[in-house]
A protein has these predicted regions:
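Hydrophobic alpha-helical transmembrane segments in multi-pass integral membrane proteins
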Residues: 223-227, 309-324
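Transmembrane helix-loop junctions at the membrane interface of multipass transporters and ion channels
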Residues: 152-161, 315-332
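C-terminal membrane-solvent junction of multi-pass transporters and transport-like membrane proteins
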Residues: 205, 209, 288-310
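Short, small-residue-biased leader/transition segments that mark boundaries at the very start
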Residues: 2-6
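Basic, alpha-helical nucleic-acid-binding regions used in initiation and control of genome expression
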Residues: 87
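Small-residue-rich transmembrane alpha-helices that serve as helix-helix interface/gating elements
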Residues: 333-346
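Membrane-embedded transport module
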Residues: 16-76, 90, 97-291
């Protein structure tokens, strides 16, 4: 009887973790009940529906279209010819490797190992890749905001850009190539499966991302502008001479005579700028994860960690041996230590 059908379907649902003791009977329907129920009523129930048994091909297709009307992204699995209408209607059709030719042609993806676990792994990797792209955008746009504003402010104040063309080439190499490799190589994280599905209308740059990009970018610019002002008034020969009170006094001091920035000061500025972006790459790694920037470093040491070391080594070699080509002079180990520790405060 129908009662036995319901009981059997609930038991199957319980065994696969779909049906729980708290679920009410209205979360299960037969194909006949589904067909006889008008769309208006089904639209109110479809998000709570867990099991539909004895469904015909048109019932499956109708279910897909009702879910899509609720702005859901629908994936359908099937292996038979009767699954073709639903596979065609869904945004993602998944056919089994041993399914019929009709089902495979109607689907977008064929699961060769016939395992539902492959679907969840694919979703996990897709979500992880999407998050990695967002991390790269956060990192890249922050550098763009900082670099562009530094150049613009310099132009308005009638001073030359403190970063030369060759230095900007190195910054762009970090921004486009190394950071892309580092952030794209981050391993997948099973916790992304706990995130709610995105709407099809969601933009890849979210509001938290925009706030982070503008907030951190403007903060970097404010600090770097103050650093330029300080160097123009202080004429230091070692970073140990840096004075925080002098930094704040010189911030808006446009009346005291200024001097041209020395090669040493330009080298300091260039290195501080790059190291700020270096640490910001760690911030981008941790963006929207509620974890430390150094979490799971062991899992990503071969990719992210290696790229981070390459950036540090490249910056050291450029400053130490770059000379006139990069408009730099070598820095002492004390300077390197102070810059490394000071810029890490952005974490």
């Amino acid at each position: 009887g129908l009662g036995d059908v319901y009981k059997r379907q609930r038991e199957i649902g319980r065994q696969i973790g779909l049906w729980t003791e708290e679920d009410t009977p209205d979360r299960l329907m037969t194909g006949v009940e589904f067909e006889q129920t008008p769309d208006a009523e089904l639209l109110d129930r479809v998000m709570d529906l867990k099991i539909m048994c004895r469904a015909r091909p048109m019932d499956k297709e109708r279910l897909v279209k009702l879910l899509q009307k609720k702005d859901q992204v629908v994936a359908v699995t099937g292996d038979g010819t009767n699954d073709a209408p639903a596979l065609n209607a869904a945004q993602v059709g998944l056919s089994m490797g041993d399914g019929t030719t009709v089902a495979k042609e109607a689907s977008a993806i064929t699961i060769l190992d016939n395992s539902f676990m492959s679907i969840s792994r694919a979703v996990m990797w897709g979500r992880s890749l999407y998050r990695n792209i967002q991390r790269f955008i956060v990192f890249q746009m922050t550098i763009n905001v900082a670099a562009c504003l530094i150049v613009l402010i310099g132009a308005f104040l009638g001073t030359e850009s403190p970063l030369t063309v060759t230095q900007m080439l190195w910054v762009n190499l970090i921004m486009d190539t190394f950071a892309a490799l580092a952030l794209a190589s981050l391993p997948s994280d099973e916790r992304v499966m706990q995130d709610p599905p995105r709407k099809t209308t969601d933009h890849i740059i979210t509001r938290p991302m925009g706030r982070n990009i503008l907030g951190v970018g403007i903060l970097f610019v404010a600090f770097l502008f103050g650093l330029l002002q300080y160097f123009k008034h202080a004429d230091i020969t070692s970073l140990t001479q840096f004075s925080l009170s002098g930094y704040f006094r010189s911030y808006l001091d446009f009346s005291t005579p200024e001097h041209e920035l020395t090669g040493y000061e330009l080298s300091l500025f260039f290195t501080i700028f790059v190291l700020l972006q270096f640490w910001n790459m760690f911030n981008a790694k941790a963006f929207n994860t509620h974890q430390s920037a150094f979490a799971r470093m062991g899992a990503s040491i071969g990719g992210f960690g290696l790229v981070a070391l390459l950036i540090l080594a490249g910056q050291y070699l450029i400053v130490t041996f770059g000379g006139k080509m990069f408009n730099v002079v070598p820095l002492s180990w004390t300077d390197w230590g102070l810059i490394f520790a000071g810029t890490s405060l952005v974490l």
